[in-house]
Amino acid sequence: GDIIDVDNDLFEHEQDGVAGTSVHGEYEAYDAYGNEYEVKYIADHLGFRVL
């Protein structure tokens, strides 16, 4: 289920899974020039990994 769900004009972060077991998510942010950056990740028994 949803663990994190944040959304505003400059930043968005969504995370799903089971806290303490396995989660996956993504976040998006904008720099001062309006460029968008997106990162998808997973965190589980193997550690935190960017996809």
UniProtKB/Swiss-Prot annotation:
Task: Show the disulfide pairing.
Answer: none
Q: Which InterPro entries match?
A: Insect_cuticle
Give the domain of life.
Eukaryota
Tissue expression notes: Calcified shell.
Q: Which GO terms describe its molecular function?
A: structural constituent of cuticle
Q: Which Pfam families match?
A: Chitin_bind_4 (PF00379)
Keyword Ligase annotated: no
Q: Which residues cross the membrane?
A: none
Q: Which UniProt keywords apply?
A: Cuticle
Q: Which residues form the Chitin-binding type R&R domain?
A: 1-51
The protein in question is named Cuticle protein CP575
